[in-house]
Design a protein with these regions (language model features):
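Tryptophan (W) side chains
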Residues: 3-4
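Bacterial N-terminal signal peptides
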Residues: 7-19
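Bacterial Sec-dependent N-terminal signal peptides
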Residues: 17-31, 413-416
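Compositionally biased, intrinsically disordered low-complexity regions
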Residues: 21-24, 28, 36, 82, ...
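Acidic/polar low-complexity interaction segments
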Residues: 24-191, 212, 216-233, 237
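Extracellular protease catalytic domains of secreted zymogens
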Residues: 118, 122-125, 162-416
Length: 416
């Protein structure tokens, strides 16, 4: 990363170091352009009612020195006293070691400039996530706790499992459902825009939060099912159902990120030149050819050329890639929108978001999951909202990409 830092320092010619707090209303801040090439910088307004020096916006708070043990949180989730997601997460975050994050900034007029790489990560992630949450509120019309509750974001967390340090993780970002936090990992060997500053990656991770809240915390049956399983230390779903739900979650995370950055090849600036950059490109060869049934049969094209792993009928072993099926789901929905970003953003994504609570309710009733459950919920919502063209395209996408599921028993909303 040294060459990258050298470029940063030569680009940001700063005059003074500022270490005090105070209002930054009306100021601007230099961040990484989260959807351009490696060293693209941009100056953006500090969000309203925010303070760039304390890294606080109405939607986001940045944290540092986060340390915790997964086993301790698992025990608390089983034994703790809490009524809902909000109280659980508030108490869980109170059990971990953490500090407010503080960037090193210099000020030129009304412009704040990061003085080191970590500070650039902090202010860039804060800016992008604040914009992402605004997008989910204004465009997607999400009204779950994911957009109502303050998002906590941790830079470089230190995680252990039963006292043993977690295997070193770099070049990544993740959403933790144990703490309702987004983790930003160190940048190491990655060639593209760092995950921690990529608007596509951060939108992907935030959609995981949206999925979690809407599926498990929007309806009483889903809440009861979720917490009953947790209290009794039971798996939420059988292996196959979990694999399919995880793949749905990943596919939607990619699709909502595409909607945010307005680019069906949203991850090309992140995974530069790697297999993932082609496998998760909604305009790429894999997305255009892949199908649910091909993955279920484990055709050699998937296992060898695209490294999708071994999962006969999605009874996966540890080497199976949920991202492969995720791309099939995302591509089917991209085709549903006619590969039109306006239709995707203004029509399809809000309908998908509204349908997520129906998934949780149905899982609570049936105790299992397959992708037909998701598509049936979305088709039913489109029908309720008199979106006939979208409904027809959804059903066509199921027929094209999920042929074995296309029947009146599994996707009845397409037939009645």
């Amino acid at each position: 990363m040294k060459w990258w830092l050298d470029h940063l320092y030569s680009t940001l010619l700063c005059a003074c170091f500022v270490g005090c707090s105070g209002s930054t209303q009306g100021d601007s801040v230099v961040v990484i352009d989260g959807h351009e090439d490696f060293a693209a910088l941009q100056t953006v307004p500090v969000p309203a009612a925010s303070d760039v020096q304390t890294l606080q916006t109405p939607h986001v708070t940045m944290r540092s020195n986060v340390r915790f043990d997964v086993a301790d949180l698992a025990d608390f989730r089983r034994d703790g006293q809490f009524a809902n997601f909000t109280s659980f997460y508030q108490q869980a975050r109170g059990r971990i070691s953490q500090d407010p994050a503080r960037p090193h900034l210099a000020k030129e007029g009304n412009k704040w400039v990061p003085q080191d790489f970590d500070s650039l990560v902090l202010v860039s992630a804060m800016h992008h996530l604040n914009s992402i949450i605004t997008y989910f509120i204004d465009v997607i019309k999400d009204n779950s706790g994911a957009t109502k509750n303050l998002l906590h974001v941790a830079i470089y967390p230190e995680i252990s499992v039963s006292g043993q340090p977690e295997y070193a993780v770099a070049d990544n970002a993740s959403y933790s459902f144990l703490l309702d936090m987004i983790f930003l990992r160190q940048s190491a060997t990655q060639r593209g825009v760092p995950f921690s500053m990529s608007s596509a990656v951060l939108a992907h991770e935030f959609q995981h939060r949206v999925f979690h809240y809407n599926v498990w915390n929007k309806t009483a049956p889903a809440q009861q099912y979720y917490w009953n399983k947790i209290r009794h230390e039971q798996q939420l779903l059988d292996t196959r159902s979990k694999n399919l739900l995880d793949a749905t979650d990943e596919g939607l995370a990619d699709l909502f990120a595409v909607g945010f950055v307005k680019d069906p090849s949203a991850f090309r600036h992140v995974f530069k030149g790697t297999l993932s950059s082609f496998r998760r490109d909604l305009q790429g060869g894999f997305a255009q050819e892949a199908s649910y049934d091909g993955l279920a049969r484990l055709d050699s094209w998937y296992a060898q050329q695209w490294q999708c792993g071994a999962a006969i009928n999605f009874q996966a072993n540890k080497n199976w890639s949920k991202y492969c099926l995720g791309t099939v789901i995302a591509r089917a929905l991209w085709e549903t929108a006619g590969q039109d970003l306006t239709v995707l953003r203004q029509q399809l994504l809000p309908v998908i978001n509204a349908s997520l609570q129906d998934i949780g309710s149905t899982i609570a009733q049936q105790g299992k999951y397959d992708v037909d459950l998701f598509f049936n919920a979305v088709v039913a919502r489109a029908t309720q909202q008199n979106m006939q063209s979208l409904r027809e395209q959804l059903c066509l996408s199921v027929w094209r990409r999920f042929r074995s599921l296309y029947n009146p028993l599994q996707v009845p909303a397409c037939f009645f």
